Regions:
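Long, charged N-terminal accessory/stalk domains
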Residues: 1-186
Length: 186
């Protein structure tokens, strides 16, 4: 049973690596090396999945921050420590009430496709009650999220490069391991 599973994993890995490219400068085929390569590919694939999810999250955070521009979240903490609450809101143009500018010190930050993005600056103890969606922003600046996106994209490219190297060099070892496992099954 284990041999059948191993055979399936080897076949799937060979197929995936073959899709990445033809074997070129191959290392001498070794069934033992083939099993090592199988584990290396599993680790790289797992890492790739994590990186892709991480990149998706960073891209969502980036999209959430873009209408607000680039600012340091620490500056909001300084305002809070000084007794002020800064809240972020979004509403349709029709829902925005200019009276909020007087009552809550509302300031429009951006207008994007008939949506108004604005902040309120009030004393900490003042309760803000608006007919608008309150926005929770990520804990870092737009610049930081852009850097995190770039670093994650680079890590994905590095991961793909490692897989491409295995595809170039190690397919014969995987085939040798597959042959050995299939011989055990028979």
């Amino acid at each position: 049973q284990d041999s059948i599973r191993l055979s399936s994993r080897l076949q799937a890995t060979l197929k995936m690596l073959h899709g990445l490219g033809e074997a070129k400068e191959t290392t001498p085929a070794s069934a033992a090396r083939g099993l090592e390569v199988l584990d290396e590919v599993d680790v790289l694939q797992s890492e790739k999945t994590k990186l892709q999810q991480q990149l998706q999250n960073y891209q969502k955070e980036k999209a959430a921050l873009e209408p607000w521009g680039d600012f340091e979240p620490e500056s909001l903490n300084l305002l809070h420590d000084a007794g002020f609450a800064v809240n972020f809101y979004c509403c349709s143009e029709g829902s925005y009430d200019e009276a909020w500018e007087e009552i809550y010190n509302a300031m429009i930050i951006n207008c994007v496709s008939s949506r108004i993005y604005f902040i309120t600056v009030t004393k900490n103890e003042v309760e803000v009650d608006l007919d608008a969606e309150q926005i929770k922003l990520p804990p870092y600046s737009l610049t930081r999220v852009q850097i995190l996106c770039q670093e994650t994209e680079q890590a994905l490219a590095d991961n793909d490069q490692k897989l491409a190297v295995l595809a170039e060099k190690e397919q014969p070892s995987l085939q040798a391991a597959l042959k050995e496992v299939n011989t055990e099954i028979e």
